[in-house]
Amino acid sequence: MMHHLIQEITKEQLRTDLPDFRPGDTVRVHVKVIEGNRERIQVFEGVVIKRRGAGISETFTVRKVSYGVGVERTFPVHTPKIAKLEVVRRGKVRRAKLYYLRQLRGKAARIKEIVR
């Protein structure tokens, strides 16, 4: 009984407006950031290196290199803090978790693009 109640509550929270994306795709995440009493949109663009979980607790991690420093940020998929998510490029990869990209530098860290 309690399980069905939890499912009903989480079903209302799930987002359906996000595009389909996978590890290897380059995405642009528009995040709502609250600074003091004002809210603004911050854009974080990078490669999706992993997706994990299912349902309301599903998350994804985006990696980018900013001023020579690798930055990874993990977002819940169904959070209201994501204003918009756009897929910039579709990548062709053969792994679900792209942790090996952390060791690669420069052109070696590129991912082949595919047309899906």
UniProtKB/Swiss-Prot annotation:
GO biological process: translation
Keywords assigned: Ribonucleoprotein, Ribosomal protein
SUPFAM superfamilies per UniProt: Translation proteins SH3-like domain
GO molecular function terms noted in the UniProt entry: structural constituent of ribosome
Superkingdom of source: Bacteria
GO cellular component, one term: cytosolic large ribosomal subunit
Coiled coil ranges: none
Function of the protein: This protein is located at the 30S-50S ribosomal subunit interface and may play a role in the structure and function of the aminoacyl-tRNA binding site.
NCBIfam families attached to this UniProt entry: rplS_bact
Family the UniProt entry places it in: Belongs to the bacterial ribosomal protein bL19 family.
Protein name: Large ribosomal subunit protein bL19
Natural source organism: Geobacillus sp. (strain WCH70)
Gene giving rise to this polypeptide: rplS
